[in-house]
Structures are given as structure tokens and as C-alpha cells.
Amino acid sequence: MAPSAASGVSSLPSGFAVFTTFPDLLFIFEFVFGGLVWILVSSSHVPIPLIQGWVMFASVFCFVATTVLAFLYVIGAHGNRTSWITLDAAYHCVASLFYFGASVLEALAAIQLQDGFLYKYYHENISAVVFSYVATLLYVVHAVFSLIRWKSS
């Protein structure tokens, strides 16, 4: 058995070290860009409710879950248990998939807005697409480094 697994010591930070260690400092950027996606999609015109419904679900779910997970890390709720490393890796993999699907669907919705809608709504949706892909990239990077941390635990 690996020494860290045998002793139950986790490499997850707690307290404000969450915001200074990589990949956990990505929580801040996931929070910001996820919030921007949520705000932009909710303020724009909805040409295809089913598509943008999934985008809203994915962005709100990831926004809330990221906020809760970051808060739990800050208060040290993981208690140095290695199961939290697994939770972190699993969550960020799922969030990456959710956001990738949401990004593709939001791009489709933006294409539908290109003709026949106000230019303002088109720009809001294009901005949502860009921020959604940035959020996807952040979640993928966090997932990769969380999987590396999980593998070494």
C-alpha cells in the first residue's frame, strides 16, 4: 500500500490554502466563469428552450456544487480522508462532461440566433458560448489534476 493511503493522510488542502494550491485554486475561476455562463444564458432570449434548459441546469448545478465543495474544503470537512480525493476527481469528471455538453448545445443555440433575432441576444449567446468553453477547459484541467492526485493517493 502507498504510504499516504495507509496513513489516511489526504493531499487535499483545507482553510484558505484551498485558494493557493493547484488544482484547487481553479475553484475560483470555475465559480466566476460558471456564474458568467449562468447569468448570460438567463438574460438572453431563448430560441430553443430544451437546449438552453440543459445549459442552465448544467451551469447552475456546477455553480452550486463547486461552491459547496469549495466551502467544505475551506472548513476542512474532508478531515484528511482519502475518500474525498475520489469525490473530488469524480465530481470534476462529471462536471467536465456536463459543461462540454452544455457548451456544444449553447453553440448550437447561438447559431440559431444568428438570423432573425436581436443582435444583442446573439452577442449574449456568443459570450455565453465562449465563457462556457472556458469553464469546460477549467473543469477538464481540474479533473485531470484531480485524477493524478487520486492515482497517487
Swiss-Prot record:
It is a multi-pass membrane protein. One of its GO terms (cellular component) is plasma membrane. Residues 18-151 form the MARVEL domain. The keyword Endoplasmic reticulum does not apply. Keywords: Cell membrane, Lipoprotein, Membrane, Transmembrane, Transmembrane helix. GO terms for molecular function: structural constituent of myelin sheath. Its main location: membrane. GO terms for biological process: myelination; protein insertion into plasma membrane. Lipoprotein. The chain crosses the membrane at residues 25-46, 54-75, 93-114, 126-147. InterPro entries: MAL (IPR013295), Marvel (IPR008253), MARVEL-CKLF_proteins (IPR050578). It holds the Pfam family MARVEL. Residues 47-53, 115-125 are extracellular. It is found in: Membrane; Cell membrane. Interacts with PLP1. May be involved in vesicular trafficking from the Golgi apparatus to the cell membrane. Plays a role in the maintenance of the myelin sheath, and in axon-glia and glia-glia interactions. Belongs to the MAL family. PANTHER family: MARVEL-CONTAINING POTENTIAL LIPID RAFT-ASSOCIATED PROTEIN, MYELIN AND LYMPHOCYTE PROTEIN. This is Myelin and lymphocyte protein. It comes from Bos taurus.
